[in-house]
């Protein structure tokens, strides 16, 4: 398996005083220029509009001044950094640069034209980098005389604040070039990761299920956007729910990225765009920038409250059913014990392959395994079945999602409600859809992350760093898999695939391999 996983030797970053050029003075270009100047480089900023580059440098100077006011930068350092920035009157002014970073429009032919011109200007030792977020690095460099010196250097916006840099190698990129850019980004205070040039690189590929599963849950009427967002924040630990985030990004942008990844992977159902989101785009409901998306953003608009179940009495008792020890189940058991319920450790023994459960006033309560509660109840021949969703940290989560089987009695369901409420959870009931909310999203993120590793796009460590530093996930998807257990994730995805009958939910071969290698101790991280 060929992959760009880590430096092949001790990498050498660019010297602090070396000359760096940034082409394009928009938000990304000016941010890159600011970071490079702050790291000690002489920086030349070029834009086809000279005044735009000059204004960008003035704006960077204002940023430095504000950092001084806040005590985050000394006046001496700010003056020195600003003094290292200058405008290029012509592209020829970048001739002596050791690194040129392109941050212009996302258009393949425009980028190819720029790099072809740069090759006639810079030295043979100059590294050429593209900040593209979506275009193949291989394709950009295909017509260069020396494509081996072209590498992706994908920053995230806002550049000064976001820690991640994806260092993307095309088929022709020499490893030492990628290594140098990796080391340079690290010296600039970033968290770089190596990636192979494939559609979406790491983040824009692996993040697709975060949006896709939320949109599907909404289309299946599992819950409203405010409730789904609250579950993802307050149980899943994500900073923003998927609908809030899509409104912030803009549905035109988010839908376009999903569609481009879907097309680039030749219609792989994993990346199928949402008809619901396309309708949002068709309607012009693009999110915050148009004043309406899944939420309304007018001056008088109030964000709707998430659904929460009415308070129920505390049940008299709860017991654990027979089943294998399970870290997720045991974490919840500890919280219930902390709320004063007498619940013993989950027994194993002869029923080591049984799913652990709680018993409460006749109801059986399980963690979702990818089947609906109704499917589970039918298999158990026990109508009073209730499922609970995954949480990042059951000790600290403030909300939990529950789903009841269609035949579950009100009495049994209310007892389970009272149990979780007595433990301090706000409970949101969702419709009985397979896989629920957090578990479904996390499992699909983990599945895509495992496929990226299996296909040599990146390492397991890189994908977890990328998702935490690039999109602020509370935990890397493969680290989350380790905490849940590979066996549980594989079972969950297999059940989800069976419930829907779709290739979208097929299990990554790497997850199956991990499971087969050692069903108990299979892990992605030591």
Language-model features: locations:
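NAD(P)-dependent Rossmann-like dehydrogenase/reductase catalytic/cofactor-binding core
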Residues: 2-15, 41, 190-197, 209, ...
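Glycine-rich Rossmann-fold phosphate-binding loop(s) that bind the pyrophosphate
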Residues: 25-26
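N-terminal Rossmann-fold NAD(P) dinucleotide-binding loop
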Residues: 29-30
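Aromatic pocket-lining residues of Rossmann-like dinucleotide-binding sites
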Residues: 36
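Conserved acidic E/D residue at the C-terminus of a beta-strand in Rossmann-like folds
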Residues: 45-50
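Rossmann-like NAD(P)-binding element
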Residues: 51-52, 66-128, 135-136, 337, ...
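A short helix-to-beta-strand connector/capping loop
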Residues: 73-86, 148-149, 190, 383, ...
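Rossmann-fold NAD(P)-binding glycine/threonine-rich loop
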Residues: 112-164, 169-183, 359-413
């Amino acid at each position: 398996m060929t992959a760009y996983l880590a430096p092949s030797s001790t990498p050498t970053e660019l010297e602090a005083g070396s000359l760096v050029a940034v082409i394009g003075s928009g938000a990304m270009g000016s941010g890159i220029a600011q970071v490079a100047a702050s790291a000690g480089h002489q920086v030349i900023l070029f834009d086809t509009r000279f005044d735009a580059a000059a204004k960008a440098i003035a704006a960077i100077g204002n940023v430095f001044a504000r950092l001084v006011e806040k005590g985050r930068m000394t006046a001496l350092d700010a003056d020195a950094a600003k003094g290292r920035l200058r405008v290029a009157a012509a592209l020829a002014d970048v001739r002596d640069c050791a690194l040129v970073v392109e941050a212009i429009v996302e258009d393949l032919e425009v980028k190819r034209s720029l790099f072809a011109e740069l090759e006639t200007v810079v030295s043979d030792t100059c590294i050429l980098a593209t900040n593209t977020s979506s275009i193949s690095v291989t394709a950009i460099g295909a017509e260069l005389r020396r494509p081996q010196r072209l590498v992706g250097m994908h920053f995230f916006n806002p550049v000064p604040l976001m820690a991640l840099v994806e260092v993307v190698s095309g088929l022709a990129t020499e490893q030492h070039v990628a290594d140098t850019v990796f080391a340079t980004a690290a010296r600039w205070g970033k968290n770089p990761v190596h990636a192979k040039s494939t559609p979406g690189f790491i983040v824009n590929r692996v993040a697709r299920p975060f949006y896709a599963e939320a949109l599907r849950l909404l289309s299946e009427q599992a819950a409203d956007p405010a409730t789904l967002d609250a579950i993802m924040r307050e149980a899943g630990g994500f900073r923003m729910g998927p609908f809030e985030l899509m409104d912030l990004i803009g549905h035109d942008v988010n839908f376009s990225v999903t569609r481009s990844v879907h097309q680039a992977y030749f219609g792989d159902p994993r990346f199928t765009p949402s008809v619901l989101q396309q309708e949002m785009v068709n309607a012009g409901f693009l999110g915050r920038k148009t004043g309406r998306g899944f939420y309304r953003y007018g001056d008088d608009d109030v964000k709707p409250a998430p659904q929460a179940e009415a308070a129920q009495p505390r049940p008299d008792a709860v017991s654990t059913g027979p089943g294998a020890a399970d870290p997720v189940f045991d974490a919840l058991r500890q919280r219930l014990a902390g709320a004063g319920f007498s619940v013993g450790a989950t027994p194993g023994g002869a029923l080591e392959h049984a799913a652990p459960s709680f018993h409460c006033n006749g109801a059986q309560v399980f963690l979702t395994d990818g089947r609906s509660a109704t499917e589970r109840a039918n298999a158990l021949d026990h109508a009073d079945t209730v499922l609970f969703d995954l949480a990042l940290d059951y000790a600290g989560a403030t909300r939990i999602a529950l789903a009841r089987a269609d035949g579950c009695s009100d009495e049994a369901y209310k007892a389970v409600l009272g149990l979780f409420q007595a433990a301090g959870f706000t409970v949101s009931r969702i419709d009985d859809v397979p896989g629920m909310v957090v578990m479904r999203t996390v499992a699909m993120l983990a599945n895509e992350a495992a496929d990226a590793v299996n296909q040599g796009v990146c390492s397991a460590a890189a994908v977890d760093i990328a998702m935490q530093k690039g999109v602020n996930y509370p935990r890397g998807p493969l680290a989350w898999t380790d905490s849940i257990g590979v066996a549980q994730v594989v079972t969950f995805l297999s059940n989800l695939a069976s419930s829907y009958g779709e290739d979208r939910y097929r299990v990554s071969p790497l997850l199956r391999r991990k499971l087969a290698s050692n069903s108990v101790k299979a892990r992605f991280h030591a």
